[in-house]
Structures are given as C-alpha cells and as structure tokens.
Amino acid sequence: MSNLSDLLPAGAGGKQVDFVASGTIGNGVTVGLNSNGTVSAIATVQNSPPVYGAESVIFVNSGEQTAVAYDSLNNKVVVAYRDNSNSSYMTAIVGTVSGSSISFGSSYVFLSRQVSFLSMDFDATAGKVVVAYKDSQDNYGYAQVGTVSGTSISFGSQVLVSGNSSDDFSVVYDGTAGKTVVFYRGTPYNVAGEAKVGTVSGTSISFGSLATWTNNNPGYISSAYDSTSGKVVVVYADQSASSAKAIVGTVSGTSISFGSEGTLDSGLLYASDTTYDSNAQRIVVAYTDANNSNYLTTIVGTVSGTSISFGTSVVVVSSYTQNSCVDFDATANKVLIAYRDNSNNNYGTTKIGTVSGTSISLSSASVFVSGLTNWLRGVYDPDSQRIVLAYSREISSQYKFVAQTAQLASQNFTSFVGISDAAISSAASGSVTIKGGISSNVTGLTANSTYYVQSDGTLSTTSSSVLAGKALSSTSINLDYTT
C-alpha cells in the first residue's frame, strides 16, 4: 500500500477509552481530563466577570504609593508601598500565587522614610526589580535595585537619578534593549519631561545621559513597553498646552531618543496608567479625562516607527475617579481596568476591555471589594494566569492593605488526554483515543511533523508546553505518551 493511512482503521488506531463529556465535544478535537473524570474540549474559557480570589492582608492600616511587578525569574509578585503601620517607611514584600490565592513572605524596609511617586518594574536581563521615587528628604529622584530570594527580598543602596527636585516617576523595562528606563518630571523648575536609561549590575544601577522629551510641564506620567515595535511609550499631561499626549522612545545602549508627540485627548488627563496588549499589538491607556467631567476613560494607541496615533476614547465610568490601573492578561488576551467607582460607594470595581484594531469595547462593571478602595495597582502573573491587584481598602472604618487575584480566563490544555473519535453530546459517553494511541480522524497534518496542543485546542507545530505527538499522515497522529 502506498499510504500509511490505508493501514489504519477508520476513526482511530487503538487505545480508545469511553468518557462522559462535560460540554459538547466535536469530532476529532483535542480533549482534556477533568478532576471528576469527565472530559471537555480543549479551549480557553473567558470569565466575565473575572473570578476573584480571596483577599490576602499584607498589613492592617492604610498603604500608599503602591507599585507592583512580576519577577519572571522567580515566578513571584513583588509589591512595594508606604507602610502607614510602620512610620510610613517604604517597604516591599514578595507574593506567591497558588491557584486563586496569594500568600506573602516577610516585608523588607528599603528606605526608612517617606517617598512619593513610587514606580517599579522587573528588569528581566538582570533578574531584579527596580524602584524609582522622589525622596522626601531632599526631593531628589533615586532608584534602588531589589533582589528576590525565595519569599524574601532585599535592596541595594540608593542611586541618584536626578540631583534636582523631581517627581512623577515611571519605570519601564525595555525588553529589546535589555535596559530599564526611568521617566520623570525634572528641571528646570520641574517643567521638563526627562528620561534616563539604567543598567543593572548586581544590586546597583547606573544611568546613561539625560534625555528630554518635552519642556511643557508634563504630569501624571505612565509608560509601557511595546514588544512588537521594540519601543517604549510614555504618556503624560502636557500642562502647558492643556492636552494629553504620548511619545515613543527608542533605546540604544545607555541612551534614549524620542519621536514626535501624539495627542490622545484635547484636554488634560489626571492620573494615567498604560499597558501593552501583545495580542492586538496596541498600547492601552486608562486615564481621568479632565476634558469630560473627570470621567475614567480608555483609549488605544498604535506605534508606527517613532510615532504613535490613537483611536477614539471610550468612557469606562461616568463619574470622577483618579484611582485606576490597566493590565493586559495574556491568557484571556484582554485588558483589565480596575478602579475606585465613585458612583458606587467608592467600591473597587473592574471592567474587561477587548481591543480590536484601534477600538476597545468594555464589559459590564464587576465589584471586587465592597469598600472604599485606594492606591490600586496590578500586574499579570503568567505562571498562575491571573492578574494580581494590590490596594488599600476601608470597610467599617477599618483600613487594610491587601492583595487578591482576578482570573479573566482559564485554560485546560495542560490536562490534554487525547482526541475524540466522534462528536459527543454533553453528558453523553463517547470514545477518545488517549495518549499512546493513534488518532486517525484529524485533518490538516503534515506527515513526520511534531505537533503540540495549543491553548485554543488546535494542533500546531508551534511549540507549547503540551506535546501532542508526531503526524503519520495528513489525518493521523501518533499521540505521545509521557505521563
């Protein structure tokens, strides 16, 4: 016989097991084994509203100046904050996400006095976190490097960023250049938008030459890294022109240069946060729109070369708010906007945003804490596939600084057990060719190619953490058995 497929029986080549289906399963699709012994089609299931974990209390009192980063070297979440239960000292703590819960190690005081305008990001090249802030002692700008070890963290000494009065710090890691960029408002007379490129070595950081992107008194600065263009984007209020703007920065060595400004709003913004949607390949900004009753607003930006343009803004909530954050969830391919809802008792609230082209659509609002919520910041944890929110909240006159998780989507591809031999109705029993068998009712394969299970249930030669097996023909695959 000329074709191997002629040797295989219709449907499958052995190792078939009957399972009860949880949900409808199509013919020849990948399935995962559930904890109750049923099987479901491999898919990414969107959660709207998000599934929230329980709050984990970091300390009892209010916290301020929240900054959050994800340490991809240690698979940990780092939270930095002003601890009002301990003389307002600047403190950091390491969180471990397990399922929907997050637990914390011991806190570490990295500066025994107050600071303001705290910002933090993880430098993946060095495997360290970098914080930057305005020191209350001299009003100068400083940075420090933090090292995570297990569930603990320690910091190196202060390094001067700006030897003049500086504020509005925003730290972002540029993955293309392998450098950390610090944006801030600096001299002269606190009206210049300035940036420096930092190189982390051990527990310290050194900075290149100063670069200025505007002299128009920028405020409410936020930034993000666009991994598609390999650029960083800084968003700010142009307080001289009374408008909201953004500009693209290109890092080369220890220097940064800037393109032309793009306008995202004809009025000022108050408080902004910025993230990058790697699925849509767009920048997403959440900001308080001073041009529209201080409503919380979001907008999508597109980087092209050294320029950035914006789509049409969308109101998140029609009430005044200056307390919000936006983070991209790579599991759901959505952004999560978290905010204090002044129209609903100042409760902590979220909306899920879906970016399409230069537009964004929003889900209904979902409350995650029924109490006054302040100093919100979040970060996506790819290990747990959840966003971690850290914030200060007050319920019944008691203040607590807490963190909790939000799950926007769940994936079951790591539970891959085999391929269905025929369509199976929900709650019905049907045959599945399990790992170690040969499934011969798949389509679109290339013989002798290795295939992997993708998070959406498809088979692809693109590597993933789940090996499916090797194709024997265009319709048959020898399913790998390793567990």
Model-derived regions: residue spans:
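Extracellular receptor-binding modules and their adjoining Ser/Thr/Gly/Asp/Asn-rich linkers
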Residues: M1-V77, Y81-D83, T91-S98, S116-K128, ...
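Beta-strand initiation motifs
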Residues: N47-A54, S98-S106, S149-S157, S201-S209, ...
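Short loop/turn motifs that cap or connect beta-strands within the blades
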Residues: G53-S62, S106-Q114, S157-S165, S209-N217, ...
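Polyanion-engaging groove/track-forming segments
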Residues: V191
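Short hydrophobic/aromatic beta-strand or adjacent loop that forms the aromatic wall/cage
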Residues: Y89, Y295
